[in-house]
Regions:
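Compact beta-sheet-dominated domain cores in extracellular/mature segments
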Residues: 6-428
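C-terminal segment of classical bacterial N-terminal signal peptides
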Residues: 1-5
């Protein structure tokens, strides 16, 4: 799989300018592309209603169900687990509003474009975008942080009702879309099949004209009415035949692609996937291992790296994947409730002395190994470990050789609800 060019890696995803109320702005982020933010630069999130195994959770349109009341019982959404069970650490548990502060609207605020105002149960006013009430996350500390939620991992119907960042539409002609991946913001067509560019083409000029080339590479045709816009231009292949180009590079689909969002075409010499912006750089000491399933991220010795994902079964659907969350969830999966066994099987990925991160998405945090809680850097007895989106990453002792991924999908519903997942850069 070819990587993005240096120019593409540094480029930022263009977006449509949309009307916004005073006090809001758009910020470019490493993982999510352009997102809406408040006056302090805090990313805005939505919590759309989602169908779970046994009911629904999340905000219906034009209504917030995130309340300033501590939920104490499970909701029974993930059958066969019953509702009404006590949630862990109730003495420390916080309300939905404490973790997800609503974006409050002033009494004199007026709707603007797709921005509307909803009334909360306590009478306060809250901003909504496209009918979805908006929130900030207590996890975000700096402008441009997106630690509260991500659109990156699509884990299916067994996932919690997740919060995700909200942003303006990407600046695209009809027939295209952008998909978030670990490699970057991937450009695909409206059927979610990858588009590609060729090193043999010139600026706004296609050199794929032979029958041999055109049997494998299909020009992405532009309609007669298509007009250049922003980073998009139109190439005249022949009289009446027009082709889309992005950043002056003519676009193609690959006739041998059998799956959506494929990287197979980039295996052909001189051909590359296209990214609206490149992805965050993983730690320099990490490696990429070729496996029977695809390309997986690994640490310096080739051991697969995993992230932990967790959402509780309350009506609030709060995440439980951070080190400040109740650790009972992780202990149940990684060690059957046995702390020592968990630490024997799953290990934090240590950061070497002097190692630094080249991105904001990957960071080095300090952890107290006796409590698994994050502590201040340099605290006596702490260890420096790698984290993705503020959450530590792990290796699994069951992986004996580079490229093994025995820990992938370990947990409830293949790790989608509460468990461990590998960082797949490519699936074959």
């Amino acid at each position: 799989m070819s990587s993005a060019s240096a120019a593409e890696s540094s480029a930022r995803e263009a977006y449509d300018k949309v009307p916004m109320p005073p006090g809001f702005k758009v910020i470019s982020t490493e993982l999510e592309g352009p997102v809406f933010a408040d006056s302090r630069g805090r990313t805005l999130y939505k919590w759309p209603i989602a169908s779970l195994r046994n009911g629904y959770a999340g905000d219906p349109k034009d209504k917030s169900v995130c309340e300033d009341k501590v939920t104490t019982k499970t909701g029974g959404f993930m059958s066969p687990y019953p509702g009404g069970l006590d949630l862990p650490d109730l003495d420390k548990r916080k309300s939905c509003v404490a973790l997800w502060p609503p974006v409050v609207a002033d009494a004199k605020a007026k709707p603007v474009g797709d921005w509307t105002i909803v009334k909360r149960s306590d009478g306060t006013l809250q901003w909504a975008y496209d009918h979805q009430p908006l929130y900030t996350s207590h996890l975000d500390q700096s402008p441009g942080d997106t630690l509260g939620g991500t659109t990156l991992f699509r884990r299916g119907g067994d996932t919690p009702a997740e919060r995700t960042p909200v942003g303006p539409p990407t600046a695209l002609p009809p027939g295209f879309r952008v998909e978030g991946t670990l490699n970057g913001r991937l450009l695909v067509n409206d059927k979610r099949y990858s588009v590609y560019v060729s090193d043999q083409d010139g600026p706004n000029k296609s050199n794929c004209t032979t029958d041999v080339c055109l049997q494998r590479w299909l020009p992405v045709l532009a309609p007669e009415t298509a007009q250049p816009q922003g980073e998009w231009s139109v190439v005249q292949r022949s009289p009446g035949v027009r082709q889309w180009a992005f950043r002056k590079q003519p676009l193609y689909t690959y006739s041998r692609d059998t799956r959506m969002m494929s990287y197979d075409g980039s295996d052909e010499p001189g051909w590359h996937n296209v990214f609206a912006q490149g992805g965050p750089k993983h730690p320099r000491s990490f490696t990429v291992q070729n496996t029977t399933y695809g390309d997986v991220l690994a640490e310096r010795n080739g051991k697969t790296v995993y992230f932990y994902t967790c959402g509780d079964d309350s009506s609030d659907q709060l995440s439980c994947d951070t080190l400040e969350s109740p650790q009972q969830y992780r202990m149940a999966i990684c060690g059957g409730g046995d702390w020592a066994r968990c630490h024997q099987l799953w290990h934090f990925v240590p950061a070497a002395a002097g190692e630094k991160s080249d991105s904001r998405i990957w960071s080095i945090i300090s952890v107290d190994p006796t409590t698994d809680r994050q502590v201040s850097a340099g605290q006596a007895g702490s260890v420096r470990v790698w984290a993705f989106r503020g959450r530590p990453v792990y290796t699994y002792s069951g992986d004996k050789e580079p490229g093994e991924f025995r820990g992938h999908s370990m947990g409830e519903w293949q790790g989608r609800r509460n468990g461990f997942r590998a960082f797949w850069l490519r699936v074959i």
